[in-house]
Amino acid sequence: MAQYLELCSVVLNLLIRAVAIFAAASLISFANISSAQAPAHPNAVELKRESASSVSFTFALNLPQVLHQVLAPQVAYGSFLQSYADLPDSAFDKEIAKAVKGLGAKAYFTLPSGAKVNIEKWQLPDTQLLRESFKVSLRLLNMPPSTGSHLDPVSVRAQAQAKTPISKVVQLQLPTALHPILVSLSNDKFWLTEHIPIAIVQLP
């Protein structure tokens, strides 16, 4: 029975990923056409099993854009960058903590039993580096698109830690603020998008 369920999950996942790849390509192409400051690199994350009950996540993110989507998507991107770059450290840190909480609330594994394992312990760069990334993004936003300048992806780490062993086959969900995002494991690669926000994952 377990082998049958695993086979079904693999087939379902292949179908989901085919749609996800098409959606991701469409979204990225649209971004390149519609935005002079479209990111040069898509968001990405690498998963690695650290132990039977722990999986690490190493993200490479267009972090100012992600934080904009989490904290103030209704505000114009340039206005968001300017207002947040000028915040006092205490207020800035409070907003980043709010963003981390928002990301963690929508990032998790779902086990075959239906139980959830949250992706927690998000580690973002320190306040000074984050603030500088906002200022650089604002300068880039005001530059002619012909320059081809862009902000390099920012490294962010997180971890899924369970009290019991995490099964080999799980369902992964990440926040839509990260989409489209390329997910990499030692044995697989696939896209998650706003329209395909979940995937069945076979952890090594």
Q: What do the predicted segments below correspond to?
A:
Residues 11, 28-31, 115:
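Serine/proline-rich low-complexity intrinsically disordered segments, especially terminal tails, linkers
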Residues 34-204:
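N-terminal soluble domains immediately following signal/targeting peptides that reside
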Residues 18-29:
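Bacterial N-terminal signal peptides
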Residues 1-15:
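N-terminal secretory signal peptides that target proteins for export/translocation
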Residues 14-17, 31, 48-49:
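Functionally constrained cores in energy, signaling, and assembly domains
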